[in-house]
């Protein structure tokens, strides 16, 4: 028997050549073994022949993504794993989304609010588009890849009363039917995902109550959406009405407006425009934060301290009258391992009692 062992060939080969070369690499009388971090090489590698090495404290585990999957399931995964999505094979945790808005905005929100990127956390955010969550999430299982996979999707709960009344116009009746239909699909989606994740501790779905755009405002982020009204509308009267709608406390009003804006611009472009106005003041929707904490369960004291330091710096830039003296002292102790997260949270709460970092700390305790 002949063996050919290649270690990290991507260090010496151009991206395009990697894909071409390893797609054609086949010797009938030779077993070829190669180690790689290349998404290009992973893309053209048969998923049945892939082994993932996971470094643990003082040992390594080996995962085989195709274990116990039927031929059709393997084929689905193989077709899906292109150069971008093979990132999930290398990630410490994975978040699956199905929309352009989530794919564009979530990394921006995390970076601007926490001062650290998803990449730094070891989390890959993958847009599955129309593939179907189950086709990808099936890779994460006790028998396959033992890494956490969070699914982010919409429950599409109704943003208005869908009861049809005698005086409703045809347009209003049509709108109510559409809202009711979306709600029904959302319930069906949840039922399906509940059954899929049952008994699998590596996969969990997290839901926006309505949709990403609506829940973004519900979380207290109307200001960010207001900033792009002038980009969406030209007519002064429409701009004024849109601002009034977005500032409304009624989800039926601001929900309909933000969805209208997103549809008019296209959700992807709408997200790009919105991304320019994300800041440390933007509130991370609760279901997204929960998904992040599921995808990556443990955080070193240095990462937590860096996030808190970032929040303090941003608040101090906005208001240099804030006194973080005690917080800084406790933060140093926390980095050195001489106090607990609870101690740090207590001092931070005295200075900024409403800061969202306290929610994160509470979830990490």
Language-model features, listed with the residues they occupy:
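Short, structured coil segments at secondary-structure junctions
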Residues: 28, 45-46
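Acidic, divalent-metal-binding catalytic cores of TOPRIM
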Residues: 42, 51, 55-365
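Catalytic acidic motif of RecA-like/P-loop NTPases
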Residues: 10-11, 39
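Conserved D-loop-proximal element of ABC-family nucleotide-binding domains
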Residues: 11-15, 19, 44
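GG-anchored amphipathic helix commonly corresponding to the ABC/SMC/Rad50 NBD signature/C-loop
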Residues: 1-6, 15
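H-loop/switch region of ABC-family ATPase nucleotide-binding domains
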Residues: 35-37
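Loop/turn-to-beta-strand initiation segments
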Residues: 2-3, 27-33
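Conserved hydrophobic alpha-helix in the ABC-type ATPase nucleotide-binding domain
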Residues: 20-21, 25
